Regions:
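Formylglycine-dependent sulfatase
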Residues: 1-218
Length: 218
């Protein structure tokens, strides 16, 4: 079925539009068309904060002043019908796939996975993330900060890496794939390579590093 929104993935292979022949002079190559975001396509920035209640910030009437978030909300959209699970990985999986956390096998955090289908923490291939949808429609995609969607047994230095952020639709990943890390000596990765940018720096702080990297990339 044709998708009127143009975001169906994966894109089906199209028949060759050119002509071929035994003689070079009789061949007509097809014009190569690269996937690209449509003209005027907006930039998309999603910010997910752990351990923050819906009514905490002034953005939604809460007591904690958040002028920067208020500016973002004023220039963007406010959604107030999203189900959270009160724990990080299931909520993140729902946000990125647009599906119930049990449907995408993330019924609990990756450290507590078991063999039941809703709890094995292995996101099914048919549940594309918003990053994968955007990437296959011409966007450059990046994740900065906490990943926490990779099964624990795939977190080793030899991979496999297809369920790391770079395998879930993100061209660029800078952050930590686990549940938590130190703000001063973090377990940090650039793509899938472990790095230690804090070495030799007494002023290093992870939050500032993540923000700087994200801004530079954008």
């Amino acid at each position: 079925m044709d998708d009127p929104t143009g975001i169906a993935i994966p894109r089906p292979t199209q028949p060759y539009a050119g002509t071929t022949s035994r003689l070079t002079d009789d061949c007509e190559p097809a014009r190569m068309v690269l996937d690209g975001a449509p003209e005027g396509a907006p930039n998309v920035v999603i910010v997910l904060l752990d351990d923050v209640g819906f009514g905490s910030f002034s953005t939604f009437g809460g007591p904690v002043p958040a002028p920067a978030l208020e500016r973002v909300a004023t220039d963007g959209l406010r959604f107030n019908q999203f189900h959270t699970t009160a724990i990080c990985a299931p909520t993140r999986a729902s946000l990125l796939t647009g599906r119930n956390h049990h449907t995408v096998h993330m019924g609990r955090i990756t450290e507590a996975a078991n063999s039941f289908p809703a709890y094995d923490t292995v996101i099914p291939r048919e549940a594309a993330t918003i990053a994968e949808v955007l990437r296959q429609n011409g966007y450059a995609t990046g994740m900065f900060g906490k990943g926490h969607l990779t099964p624990q047994w795939e977190m080793g230095p030899a991979g496999p890496f297809d369920r790391w952020p770079t395998g879930l639709g993100f061209d660029r990943f800078y952050g930590f794939p686990g549940a938590e890390t130190s703000q001063f000596e973090p377990d940090l990765y650039d793509q899938t390579t472990p790095i230690a940018p804090y070495l030799g720096r007494g002023d290093y702080h992870l939050t500032e590093d993540i923000a700087d990297r994200a801004i530079d990339w954008m």
